From Swiss-Prot:
Organism phylogeny: Bacteria, Pseudomonadati, Pseudomonadota, Gammaproteobacteria, Enterobacterales
Domain HTH gntR-type, residue spans: 6-74
GO terms assigned for molecular function: DNA binding; DNA-binding transcription factor activity; fatty-acyl-CoA binding
Protein name: Fatty acid metabolism regulator protein
GO BP field: fatty acid metabolic process; regulation of fatty acid metabolic process
Record's GO cellular component terms: cytoplasm
GN (gene name): fadR
DNA-binding residue intervals: 34-53
SUPFAM superfamilies: GntR ligand-binding domain-like, Winged helix' DNA-binding domain
Record's subunit section: Homodimer.
Gene3D superfamilies: GntR ligand-binding domain-like, Winged helix-like DNA-binding domain superfamily/Winged helix DNA-binding domain
Keyword field: Activator, Cytoplasm, DNA-binding, Fatty acid metabolism, Lipid metabolism, Repressor, Transcription, Transcription regulation
Main subcellular location of this protein, as a coarse class: cytoplasm
Record-linked InterPro entries: FA-response_TF_FadR, FadR_C, TF_FadR/GntR_C, Tscrpt_reg_HTH_GntR, WH-like_DNA-bd_sf, WH_DNA-bd_sf
Organism per entry: Klebsiella pneumoniae subsp. pneumoniae (strain ATCC 700721 / MGH 78578)
Length: 239
């Protein structure tokens, strides 16, 4: 186990998470007693206690007063906030994780974009208008793309969609910085935003589904070609 952390708390958190991932502390098992675990990791009990509370909030553990701390099946108990952690833990599965993330984005955005156009077209157009002045480089497009999808999610009037996008932000924007290094990807995105604006202005809400699905397919093809050059630190630096 190789852990790179800057603080005792960070070290303890990564030690426990990687131990859960590697089944040293398998789901359903009980963590060692606080004194034993603090000595094993090499941190104070106060630091360990803070770390355990944080991991419990993220769904890795269940803390029950007066009872041992239980290791959860994190797939069933955690939220989107652990996406970056999963990418860092299992480098080989990063492409599949990213495919799943982008599939979810496409599926839910067909719903919230159509709703935004139908119920709050002025807000939706204001979000899309931000694409007019974007600088032509990867970082700017990664930020723009995330902000457009997030902005349209909130423009739908259902803030839950926005919260879902919030949970995706870390991994989403990191992927975006690699994806939008391609001029073809940037051009495709600008065309997509422009088409969305035209559909919104014309009130053609029923065209959103096909437009978003087609963009998901076309951008997916570019992404799959780029996966061969996926930077090795895409997951490694996620912490």
């Amino acid at each position: 186990m190789v852990i790179k952390a800057q603080s005792p708390a960070g070290f303890a958190e990564e030690y426990i998470i990687e131990s859960i991932w590697n089944n040293r502390f398998p789901p359903g098992s009980i963590l060692p007693a606080e004194r034993e675990l603090s000595e094993l990791i090499g941190v104070t009990r106060t630091t360990l206690r803070e770390v355990l509370q944080r991991l419990a909030r993220d769904g890795w553990l269940t803390i029950q007063h007066g009872k041992p701390t239980k290791v959860n099946n994190f797939w069933e108990t955690s939220g989107l906030n652990i996406l970056e952690t999963l990418a860092r833990l299992d480098h080989d599965s990063v492409p599949q994780l990213i495919d799943n993330l982008l599939s979810v984005r496409t599926n839910i955005s067909t719903i919230f974009i159509r709703t935004a156009f139908r119920q709050h077209p002025d807000k939706a157009l204001a979000v899309l208008d931000s694409a007019r002045e974007v600088e032509d480089h990867a970082d700017a497009f990664a930020e723009l793309d995330y902000n457009i999808f997030r902005g349209l999610a909130f423009a739908s009037g259902n803030p839950i969609y926005g919260l879902i996008l919030n949970g995706m932000k870390g991994l989403y924007t990191r992927i975006g910085r690699h994806y939008f290094s391609s001029p073809e990807a940037r051009s495709l995105a600008l065309g997509f935003y422009h088409q969305l604006a035209k559909v919104c202005e014309a009130g053609l809400h029923d065209q959103v589904y096909e437009l978003v699905r087609r963009y998901g397919h076309d951008s997916g093809e570019i992404w799959h070609r780029m996966q061969k050059s996926l930077p090795g630190d895409l997951a490694m630096n996620m912490r």
